[in-house]
Amino acid sequence: MAKVNEWKTAISTDATDLISLQHMIDCGITAMELSVSAACVHEIDWQGLRDHAAAVGMEVWSYHLPFADAINIAAPDESARAAAVARQCGLIDLANAIGVRRFVIHPSAEPIPDDERSAWMASAKKSLAELAEYAAARDSVICVEDLPRTCLGHTADEMLELIAVDDRLRVCFDVNHLCTAYGCTHAEFVEKLGDKIVTTHMSDYDFIDEKHFFPGVGLINWKSLIELLEDAGYDGPFLYEGGFSPSHWAPEKPYGTIETARERHMTIKELTGAE
């Protein structure tokens, strides 16, 4: 059972240049998730990323597939759903060609009207089954991310329903996406999905809505959360998503730096929050 100090320190980033990757390595960040907005995916220099990562010893751990209303794999309209899946498959091919094997995906866009939720869920499950098959043929895995608010996957039970369509689907646990309004705690999530969690998005929040604060700025009891993941056998990276610039939701809050990311990871169990 890997302890948190044995996990790699990682970051979700759009950086692909040699200088940025070298700086991350110098700061103890040895793995990365590539995450680029839907509007900018055509600008990704895939071969440059491969070469730069190899040159500095950076592992390209995962690729966060883009998310936008126009790339909604849960779209009830079949033509829109199929187009979204096709676009994601094309991006999987590009990342797979440089050795990326883990693909994080949002199971839906938002908002979802209550009376349409079942239709969105059916579309998402159809899409995830297709994507799981496509990824598996390329020795890769789809990592379904839990989401906040009215999005699909806002509870452990919805996540279980989503990934049940294919045994090869796995989970990206975004720890700041479980909103109190929907009644799912970190403990319940890890209890029900712990054996499927293969990657994470680490940031802090207030339990009301996502905030992407630097760990320690919000209310998460990190000691408790990390022990849940350790006990579940998690051995992926401590992968930051956000927290290195002012939060979109609360810009007045303090934030961390690339230089302090590794230290915060190594001392994370000292933070007991107010959970």
Give the location of each predicted region.
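Active-site-proximal loop/turn and secondary-structure-junction residues that shape catalytic pockets
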Residues: 15-17, 36-38, 66-69, 109-111, ...
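Metal-dependent catalytic neighborhoods of phosphoester/phosphodiester hydrolases
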Residues: 43-46, 114-115, 249-251
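Conserved beta-strand positions
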Residues: 11, 32-34, 105, 144, ...
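Active-site acidic/histidine proton-transfer and metal-coordination neighborhood
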Residues: 55, 74-170, 180
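Histidine-acidic metal/acid-base catalytic patches
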Residues: 1-6, 15-25, 101, 153, ...
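Residue-level detector of anion-binding/catalytic polar loops
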Residues: 30-31, 59, 101, 141, ...
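N-terminal pre-domain/capping segments
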Residues: 1-96, 170, 195, 255-275
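Catalytic-core regions built around general acid/base machinery
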Residues: 46-57, 127-134, 188-192, 224-228
